[in-house]
Amino acid sequence: MIWDWGFTWKNLYVLSCYIALDLTAYSGTDGQGTGSVSVVDSHFNGVPYAITLSGHDPEPDIILDNLLVENSASVVLVSGGETILPGSTGALYFNSWGMGPQYFNSDGSGARKTGFINPAPNKPTSLLDTSTGRYFTRSKPQYENSSPIIATAHGISNDGTGDQTAAINSLLSSNIGSVIFFPAGIYLAEGTIEVPVGSIITGSGWSQIVAVGAYFYDQTSPKVLIQVGNEGDSGIVEISDMLFTVRGPTAGCILMEWNVHESTQGSAGMWGKMFPIAYGHSFDIS
């Protein structure tokens, strides 16, 4: 893994592999390494050097949460150097272990710590799968048995020209409960896209809805690009493989306002989503 990003790995099962996570790579002109890694609800078995670091400063921040390790000599180590968290020939269970900054106050004061976290962070039961005690997950819907409504067949342009706000809002409001497919492309919006409860939206290769225009100029009077439901709503909303971003002077843009609470566990969610700012080289932002 490279870049100064935060990675979360869940439900990993690594069996009989030399290394599970290699964090030794540095890239770019500034030699960026991995920013942080969280390994959650996972299992390493027969992995002698499970999480390998470079030894360069700064090291990535690491959180291990509900991790089972078996027959592994080292759990966290510096490549060719010291072992930070030793393993065992038997089974070890790590409820909560961390390496990184520990902050004491809101002013940012603190110190870098390495070791077990006690007490472990509280996990609200609403976030857990009651059958396993692990964090609840739901796989990305595929809609393989659906007949989607194709946005571009209903007067909506994906060629990066013209305001598509009204056309998209009309399509969404009149097709609640149906799968609406946005083919790959750029859909410009000069106003707020309103996503009603019951909407099912999917794209292709991160289909882009892009905020543009005077509506989003003023940072003292911010406006929302994607409004999901209204305050107090609950029910079903599914959004996948979409990208929401901005073009040009849009200091007053809030990319998304989410108002919908799940009616059943996992009924309201997003998969494969991106919210980049100044995405690419043609978005008129420096």
Locations of the language-model features?
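Extracellular "leader-to-stem" segments immediately downstream of a signal peptide or signal-anchor
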Residues: 1-3, 7-178, 208, 214-219, ...
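Extracellular beta-strand-rich solenoid/capping regions of secreted or surface-exposed proteins
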Residues: 188-200, 211-240, 245-264
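Tight coil/turn sites that cap or link beta-strands
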Residues: 184-185, 198, 206
